[in-house]
Amino acid sequence: MELYQGVVLGVLQGLTEFLPVSSSGHLVLGQNFFGITEPALSFDISVHLGTLFAVALVFFKEIKAMVVSLGRLVQNLGSLKNFKQVVKADGDVRLAALIIVGSIPTAVIGLILKNYVHALFSSLVIVGSMLMVTGTFLWLTRHSTPGGKKVEQIGFGTALFIGVCQGVAVIPGISRSGATIAAGLFSGVERETAARYSFLLSMPAIAGAEILSLKESFATGAGFDTVTLLSTLTAFIVGTLALVALLKIVKKGRFYLFAPYCWVVGLISIIAGFVA
């Protein structure tokens, strides 16, 4: 892979990991454009680490607050009379619990689909079709009733539902952020809270996938070169900017504006797939 190709793919990963247009779908399109049939596993791991660090940077305060609250909870566990009440009343503990609950269906679905999804990355028709699906549920958020649920009002059933949507987003062309934020909005969650939860929920999913991929990478002896490292840095910088921008867009209720883009790119992908 040439240096400029790695940088372009890093930009694509950084932008599309958080914007609701499917990072996996766009990486497939980018790889097809450059004629890269099978990118190095170490490259895939690295660019995803770049976007994981972007989430950690943007939500550092929230992550720190959750860690502190959970630490305090563990220290006082023996003296707590009503554990459930504490989880419900403490917003930081509640958020951590919701992330854990939401991560369960994501992990189960991801492990089940892992071997089947790999083959889909070579199909422009499937990627394009799933982008059309992504565009449709993004557009439907325009008609969702604005909810007011904050973290303390989100039920574990809602967390499971959002986690299922995140798991399904392993299919290339289905946007993870689009699916999870839309699921939150349809469930009556307040816009900014839905976005915050979506991106914090992505951290265990990305980290878990990275651990599995690293194990495979070490087994194959894959290494990390200059192109890979520069792509990672690019994904981190662009991802941070994209994440901050999307939070503002969701807060203003303009999430649906990404739908036409998904439809256009999806249609082009389907046509290109049939022509090829």
Curated annotation (Swiss-Prot):
Keywords: Antibiotic resistance, Cell inner membrane, Cell membrane, Cell shape, Cell wall biogenesis/degradation, Hydrolase, Membrane, Peptidoglycan synthesis, Transmembrane, Transmembrane helix
Catalytic activity: di-trans,octa-cis-undecaprenyl diphosphate + H2O = di-trans,octa-cis-undecaprenyl phosphate + phosphate + H(+)
InterPro entries with a match to the protein in the record: UppP
EC number(s) stated in the UniProt entry for this protein: 3.6.1.27
Signal peptide: none
TM stretches of this protein: 1-21, 40-60, 93-113, 120-140, 154-174, 199-219, 227-247, 255-275
General function of this protein: Catalyzes the dephosphorylation of undecaprenyl diphosphate (UPP). Confers resistance to bacitracin.
Additional notes on this entry: Bacitracin is thought to be involved in the inhibition of peptidoglycan synthesis by sequestering undecaprenyl diphosphate, thereby reducing the pool of lipid carrier available.
Name this polypeptide is given: Undecaprenyl-diphosphatase
Gene source species: Desulforapulum autotrophicum (strain ATCC 43914 / DSM 3382 / VKM B-1955 / HRM2) (Desulfobacterium autotrophicum)
Gene that specifies this protein: uppP
